[in-house]
Protein backbone atom coordinates (compact mmCIF):
# COMPACT_ATOMS: atom_id res chain seq x y z
CA UNK A 1 0.00 0.00 0.00
CA UNK A 2 1.35 3.40 -0.97
CA UNK A 3 1.31 6.44 1.31
CA UNK A 4 0.54 9.94 0.04
CA UNK A 5 1.92 12.71 2.26
CA UNK A 6 0.61 16.24 1.69
CA UNK A 7 2.76 18.82 3.43
CA UNK A 8 0.68 21.88 4.32
CA UNK A 9 -1.87 21.62 1.49
CA UNK A 10 -3.79 24.85 0.88
CA UNK A 11 -6.69 24.13 -1.48
CA UNK A 12 -9.59 22.00 -0.21
CA UNK A 13 -10.66 20.77 -3.65
CA UNK A 14 -7.18 19.36 -4.28
CA UNK A 15 -7.29 17.47 -1.00
CA UNK A 16 -10.73 16.09 -1.88
CA UNK A 17 -9.58 14.99 -5.33
CA UNK A 18 -6.50 13.34 -3.84
CA UNK A 19 -8.68 11.56 -1.27
CA UNK A 20 -10.75 10.19 -4.14
CA UNK A 21 -7.58 8.92 -5.84
CA UNK A 22 -6.60 7.29 -2.54
CA UNK A 23 -10.03 5.66 -2.29
CA UNK A 24 -9.74 4.26 -5.81
CA UNK A 25 -6.21 2.95 -5.33
CA UNK A 26 -6.02 1.96 -1.66
CA UNK A 27 -3.39 4.56 -0.78
CA UNK A 28 -3.22 6.02 2.71
CA UNK A 29 -3.46 9.82 3.00
CA UNK A 30 -1.23 11.69 5.47
CA UNK A 31 -1.87 15.41 6.06
CA UNK A 32 0.81 17.62 7.62
CA UNK A 33 -0.49 20.80 9.30
CA UNK A 34 -1.04 23.61 8.99
CA UNK A 35 -3.77 22.98 6.44
CA UNK A 36 -5.18 25.84 4.39
CA UNK A 37 -8.70 24.59 5.16
CA UNK A 38 -10.76 22.62 7.64
CA UNK A 39 -10.89 18.96 6.61
CA UNK A 40 -14.64 19.01 7.22
CA UNK A 41 -15.15 21.86 4.71
CA UNK A 42 -17.85 21.31 2.15
CA UNK A 43 -15.40 21.77 -0.76
CA UNK A 44 -13.16 18.97 0.53
CA UNK A 45 -16.08 16.62 1.06
CA UNK A 46 -17.65 17.44 -2.30
CA UNK A 47 -14.43 16.80 -4.23
CA UNK A 48 -14.01 13.44 -2.47
CA UNK A 49 -17.65 12.58 -3.19
CA UNK A 50 -18.93 9.65 -1.18
CA UNK A 51 -15.56 7.89 -1.08
CA UNK A 52 -14.30 9.19 2.27
CA UNK A 53 -15.19 5.96 4.07
CA UNK A 54 -12.70 4.16 1.78
CA UNK A 55 -9.75 6.38 2.75
CA UNK A 56 -7.39 6.02 5.70
CA UNK A 57 -6.56 9.61 6.67
CA UNK A 58 -3.92 10.56 9.24
CA UNK A 59 -2.99 14.06 10.34
CA UNK A 60 0.11 15.42 12.03
CA UNK A 61 1.17 18.67 13.66
CA UNK A 62 4.33 18.94 11.53
CA UNK A 63 6.95 16.84 9.72
CA UNK A 64 8.72 15.95 12.98
CA UNK A 65 5.45 14.56 14.34
CA UNK A 66 4.97 12.58 11.11
CA UNK A 67 8.43 10.99 11.23
CA UNK A 68 8.05 10.19 14.94
CA UNK A 69 4.88 8.20 14.19
CA UNK A 70 5.87 6.44 10.94
CA UNK A 71 8.61 3.97 10.06
CA UNK A 72 9.53 5.30 6.61
CA UNK A 73 11.64 2.75 4.75
CA UNK A 74 11.35 4.34 1.30
CA UNK A 75 10.27 7.84 0.33
CA UNK A 76 10.13 10.01 -2.76
CA UNK A 77 9.79 13.78 -2.70
CA UNK A 78 8.04 15.30 -5.71
CA UNK A 79 9.41 18.68 -6.70
CA UNK A 80 9.85 20.75 -9.84
CA UNK A 81 13.42 21.34 -8.54
CA UNK A 82 14.38 17.66 -8.55
CA UNK A 83 17.25 16.46 -10.76
CA UNK A 84 15.62 13.21 -11.96
CA UNK A 85 12.31 12.06 -13.39
CA UNK A 86 9.76 10.11 -11.37
CA UNK A 87 9.94 7.52 -14.18
CA UNK A 88 13.51 6.72 -13.07
CA UNK A 89 12.40 5.98 -9.51
CA UNK A 90 11.83 2.39 -8.41
CA UNK A 91 8.79 2.46 -6.17
CA UNK A 92 8.38 -0.19 -3.47
CA UNK A 93 5.18 -1.29 -1.78
CA UNK A 94 4.65 0.83 1.32
CA UNK A 95 6.69 3.79 0.07
CA UNK A 96 5.81 7.35 1.03
CA UNK A 97 5.26 9.99 -1.67
CA UNK A 98 5.70 13.55 -0.39
CA UNK A 99 4.04 16.55 -2.06
CA UNK A 100 4.31 20.17 -0.96
CA UNK A 101 1.86 23.02 -0.72
CA UNK A 102 0.41 24.35 -3.94
CA UNK A 103 2.11 27.77 -3.81
CA UNK A 104 5.63 26.79 -2.72
CA UNK A 105 6.12 23.04 -2.92
CA UNK A 106 8.12 21.17 -0.30
CA UNK A 107 10.37 23.20 2.03
CA UNK A 108 13.86 23.75 0.61
CA UNK A 109 15.60 22.33 3.71
CA UNK A 110 13.47 19.17 3.45
CA UNK A 111 14.45 18.75 -0.21
CA UNK A 112 18.13 19.25 0.65
CA UNK A 113 17.93 16.68 3.45
CA UNK A 114 16.41 14.13 1.05
CA UNK A 115 18.21 15.14 -2.15
CA UNK A 116 18.64 11.55 -3.42
CA UNK A 117 14.92 10.89 -3.04
CA UNK A 118 13.75 13.92 -5.05
CA UNK A 119 12.01 13.34 -8.38
CA UNK A 120 9.98 15.47 -10.75
CA UNK A 121 7.33 15.00 -13.38
CA UNK A 122 8.79 16.21 -16.68
CA UNK A 123 6.94 19.10 -18.30
CA UNK A 124 7.53 22.06 -20.55
CA UNK A 125 10.01 24.59 -19.21
CA UNK A 126 7.52 27.47 -19.50
CA UNK A 127 5.07 25.76 -17.12
CA UNK A 128 5.72 26.35 -13.40
CA UNK A 129 4.05 23.21 -12.15
CA UNK A 130 1.14 20.82 -12.45
CA UNK A 131 -1.97 20.93 -10.29
CA UNK A 132 -1.26 19.10 -7.02
CA UNK A 133 -4.02 16.52 -7.43
CA UNK A 134 -2.88 15.78 -10.99
CA UNK A 135 0.74 15.36 -9.85
CA UNK A 136 -0.37 12.94 -7.13
CA UNK A 137 -2.45 10.88 -9.58
CA UNK A 138 0.36 10.70 -12.15
CA UNK A 139 2.88 9.55 -9.56
CA UNK A 140 0.55 7.11 -7.82
CA UNK A 141 -0.36 5.34 -11.03
CA UNK A 142 3.29 5.08 -12.12
CA UNK A 143 4.14 3.53 -8.75
CA UNK A 144 1.18 1.16 -8.99
CA UNK A 145 2.12 0.23 -12.57
CA UNK A 146 5.60 -0.73 -11.37
CA UNK A 147 4.02 -2.85 -8.62
CA UNK A 148 1.61 -4.54 -11.12
CA UNK A 149 -1.45 -2.70 -9.79
CA UNK A 150 -1.82 -4.67 -6.54
CA UNK A 151 -5.41 -5.15 -5.45
CA UNK A 152 -6.81 -3.19 -8.40
CA UNK A 153 -9.08 -4.32 -11.19
CA UNK A 154 -7.25 -3.79 -14.46
CA UNK A 155 -10.01 -4.57 -16.91
CA UNK A 156 -13.58 -3.33 -17.12
CA UNK A 157 -16.60 -5.10 -18.54
CA UNK A 158 -18.59 -3.65 -21.42
CA UNK A 159 -22.34 -4.19 -21.19
CA UNK A 160 -22.63 -5.11 -24.88
Regions found by a protein language model. Name each.
Residues 1-160:
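Post-transcriptional modification and biogenesis factors for structured RNAs
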